[in-house]
UniProtKB/Swiss-Prot annotation:
It comes from the Bacteria. The gene is nagB. The keyword Magnesium does not apply. The active site is at D73 (proton acceptor), N142 (for ring-opening step), H144 (proton acceptor), E149 (for ring-opening step). NCBIfam families: nagB. This is Glucosamine-6-phosphate deaminase.
Amino acid sequence: MGGINVIEIEIVPDHESASARVAGFIVEQIRRKPASVLGLATGGTPERTYELLVEKVNAGHLSFSQATTFNLDEYVGLLPDHPQSYHAYMRFRLFGETDFDAERTHLPKGTADELSDAGGQYEALIAEAGGIDLQLLGLGANGHIGFNEPGATEDSRTRVVDLTEETIAANARFFDSPEDVPRRALTMGIATILEAREIVLIATGESKAEAVERSVRGPVAPQMPASFLQQHPSVTFVLDEAAASLLDKRA
């Protein structure tokens, strides 16, 4: 890695189409390798993707029983049963609704006694599982992937980070008030993400258009964390027309 690669761009009409396409990537991966290691994301964007996967499992068309998962991040200080924790998000939207083996679903421990050790322990678990086959990403309006905020470095690993005011404001809709949003999170690093064998990023809506354009066409720089994806040999951005609106579609 380190060279610049062409990010594959798929543009679809709307969020529903994007969600279906990303669900298709995951279905294809599991059918190709039932014991796949999946990297998973949270937030509003992938919710419909997870709903579609639940429908496929419940219809008998898909099984996650042999799969292993690693989520990108978790808030620091929220217990796993806190309704806004990402443990609860995944349990409610995917894990508890399908046939995933709970022993093989992993999220960073934001309540670990020794947070300084939690990142290294998470990295070790990923390595022990053989690395991530397919990593799902969302995209923040400021270009963050996971909770790697602007300024994140290419060599960063799973660690505790401070959230920007922009990210706190964006996530406030999930909490009773902005004051309730945690100020720190435990997140996979840029280097961790780039070690996945394949990466699929979903971005929808006009609010993501500038970050998409800078990630795909702009220089690779810490101030636009998703731009580091240009250095990965197998990345696909699945975009709706609004998120792709600033791209030259002939490129």
